[in-house]
C-alpha cells in the first residue's frame, strides 16, 4: 500500500526551510502566522531579543463571530493596530509554511490595510 504524506510534517519542513532565510529584528520584526483547524494566531516577533511585541488570535474576545476567513480578517486588523500602537510599521511576513491563500492571505491583506508594510 502506498503511504500518504503527512501534510503537517511537509508544512513544518517548509517552515523550517523558510525560517532559515528570514529573521525579525527590532527595526523590522517578523509577523508570524499559525493556522489550526479551529483558529488563526498572529504574532509580531523580534527574533534578536526573542520577544513577542504584539499578538492577536481567534481566542480574543473581539474575534468570536463569523466564518474562519472573516475571523482571520479581524485578527489581521487587530495585530496591525496593536503593532502600530507600539510604533511598528514595517514587518517581515512569515506565512508559517502555509500557502498564501485563503485565511493566511485574508489576514495579510487586513494587516496591510491597517498600517503594516510588507
Swiss-Prot record:
One BP annotation, GO: translation
Basic residues: compositionally biased ranges: 10-20
Gene Ontology molecular functions: 5S rRNA binding; structural constituent of ribosome
Q: Where is this region: Disordered?
A: 1-26
Question: What InterPro entries does the annotation carry?
Answer: Ribosomal_uL18_bac-type, Ribosomal_uL18_bac/euk
The domain of life is Bacteria
- Coiled-coil positions are none
Cite the Gene3D superfamilies for this sequence: 3.30.420.100
Q: Does rRNA processing appear among the keywords?
A: no
Keywords, A to Z, come to:
Ribonucleoprotein, Ribosomal protein, RNA-binding, rRNA-binding
Give GO cellular component annotations, separated by semicolons. Answer: cytosolic large ribosomal subunit
Similarity section: Belongs to the universal ribosomal protein uL18 family.
- UniProt-listed PANTHER family: 39S RIBOSOMAL PROTEIN L18, MITOCHONDRIAL, LARGE RIBOSOMAL SUBUNIT PROTEIN UL18M
How does it associate, per the subunit comment? Part of the 50S ribosomal subunit; part of the 5S rRNA/L5/L18/L25 subcomplex. Contacts the 5S and 23S rRNAs.
Tell me, in a sentence or two, what this protein's role is.
This is one of the proteins that bind and probably mediate the attachment of the 5S RNA into the large ribosomal subunit, where it forms part of the central protuberance.
| Cross-referenced NCBIfam families | L18_bact
This chain belongs to the protein called Large ribosomal subunit protein uL18
What species is given as this protein's source? Streptococcus equi subsp. equi (strain 4047)
Query: Which gene name does the record give?
Result: rplR
Amino acid at each position: 500500500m502506498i503511504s500518504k504524506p503527512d501534510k503537517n510534517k511537509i508544512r513544518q519542513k517548509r517552515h523550517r526551510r523558510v525560517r532559515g532565510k528570514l529573521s525579525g529584528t527590532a527595526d523590522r520584526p517578523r509577523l508570524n502566522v499559525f493556522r489550526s483547524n479551529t483558529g488563526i494566531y498572529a504574532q509580531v516577533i523580534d527574533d534578536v531579543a526573542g520577544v513577542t511585541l504584539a499578538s492577536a488570535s481567534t481566542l480574543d474576545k473581539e474575534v468570536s463571530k463569523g466564518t474562519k476567513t472573516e475571523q482571520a480578517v479581524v485578527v489581521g486588523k487587530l495585530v496591525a493596530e496593536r503593532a502600530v500602537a507600539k510604533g511598528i510599521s514595517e514587518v517581515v511576513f512569515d506565512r508559517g509554511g502555509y500557502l498564501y491563500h485563503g485565511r493566511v492571505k485574508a489576514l495579510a491583506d487586513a494587516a496591510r490595510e491597517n498600517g503594516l508594510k510588507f
